[in-house]
């Protein structure tokens, strides 16, 4: 069974692997094939109480990826498009999938700002896998089929 864990914490890794390794028959190679670690990254620490700071989450994500695990970023809600883009740039090379979505109902996004974000995402080096949530495609009235190949649908399986 494939498992995706999503967190705003960075301080769980040592205890998590200590507990896993205590289980009879634990095989980290199997875990690497079936566990993906995701981190919510908004770039706005002050608005995320009881969360590890974004730089700590990014560091933990990099460590897990170096250890052989799949990783993903939930860049949502986008609080500020430029900040979200910077967080994505800061994690290039050790993130297997980016999920980008808007805050529903509480923020008045300028359509031009969201379009600029998508335009910049299309220019990222290495063509990382990106899933735009319906909040983004709906606002821009974009059909996912018109996006570049590295933009994936909700049926994308990061374990294949």
Which residue ranges define each predicted feature?
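Conserved AdoMet/S-adenosylmethionine-binding subsite of the radical SAM
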Residues: 1-128
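C-terminal accessory extensions appended to soluble enzyme cores
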Residues: 108-160
């Amino acid at each position: 069974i494939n498992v995706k864990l999503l967190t705003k914490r960075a301080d769980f890794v040592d205890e998590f692997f200590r507990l896993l390794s205590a289980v009879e028959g634990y095989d980290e190679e199997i875990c690497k094939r079936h566990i993906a670690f995701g981190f919510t990254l908004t770039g706005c620490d002050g608005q995320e109480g009881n969360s590890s700071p974004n730089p700590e989450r990014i560091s933990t994500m990099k460590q897990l990826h170096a250890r052989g695990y799949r990783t993903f970023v939930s860049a949502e809600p986008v609080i500020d498009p430029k900040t979200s883009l910077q967080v994505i740039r800061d994690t290039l090379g050790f993130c297997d999938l980016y999920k980008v979505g808007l805050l529903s109902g509480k923020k008045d996004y300028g359509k031009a700002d969201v379009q600029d974000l998508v335009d910049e995402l299309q220019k990222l080096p290495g063509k990382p896998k990106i899933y735009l949530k319906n909040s983004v495609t709906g606002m821009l009235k974009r059909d996912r089929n018109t996006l570049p190949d590295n933009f994936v649908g909700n049926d994308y399986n990061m374990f294949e």
